[in-house]
């Protein structure tokens, strides 16, 4: 799957071939087709992986959790071909017809669910429409990553996503909540480090229990 993601990320869906993927993966055609029936099936697997990664640690503030999710994605986008390929597959020509919009509908849904929870907790200003805000925020995030990729090969994506939230959140978050939110450009790296510490502690706990 990682080999397929790398090829899709570098060449796009149409230009990528099964031969390219086989060469990159170092496996036989039979081994590949045992798991995936076609190039389209492989691409769907890459798209499904967008939501397979464990989520960020739960936060008292759902708006913080949404920032953390987005900043972790920005951090990993530069380092994980699976995420980068998923973005390219979702936004390429004719991808709506082939994949139904790729991961875009899923991310809009994830964003809206967090905003609904934030509203229930009193974190949002009264005028905020969660569905419209989720669509707009997701579209803005996508635009930021496309511009960052086009202009500087995503070298500034974490800074740009941070700036996005600094511009959007004052119009939707209550002042008390806004004052407590952490939205700096290093937030993604900090949360990833936190997740690794939690995973390591869980492994140690399992070993002790066994």
Question: Where do the PLM segments sit?
Answer:
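Helix-turn-helix
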Residues: 3, 7-41, 45, 49
């Amino acid at each position: 799957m990682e080999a397929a993601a790398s090829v899709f990320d570098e060449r796009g869906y149409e230009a990528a071939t099964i031969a390219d993927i086989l060469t990159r993966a170092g496996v036989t055609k039979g081994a590949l087709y045992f798991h995936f029936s076609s190039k389209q099936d492989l691409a769907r697997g890459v798209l499904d992986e967008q939501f397979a990664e464990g989520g960020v640690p739960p936060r008292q503030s759902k708006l913080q959790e949404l920032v953390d999710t987005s900043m972790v994605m920005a951090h990993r986008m530069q380092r994980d071909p699976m995420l980068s390929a998923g973005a390219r597959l979702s936004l390429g020509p004719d991808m709506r017809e082939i994949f139904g919009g790729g991961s875009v509908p899923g991310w809009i849904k994830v964003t809206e669910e967090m905003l609904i929870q934030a509203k229930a907790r009193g974190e949002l200003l009264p005028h905020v429409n969660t569905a419209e805000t989720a669509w707009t925020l997701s579209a803005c995030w996508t635009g930021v990553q496309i511009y960052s990729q086009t202009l500087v090969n995503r070298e500034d994506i974490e800074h740009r996503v941070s700036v996005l939230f600094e511009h959007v959140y004052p119009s939707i978050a209550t002042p008390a909540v806004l004052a407590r939110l952490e939205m700096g450009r290093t937030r993604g790296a900090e949360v990833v480090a936190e997740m690794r510490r939690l995973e390591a502690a869980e492994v140690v706990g399992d070993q002790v229990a066994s």
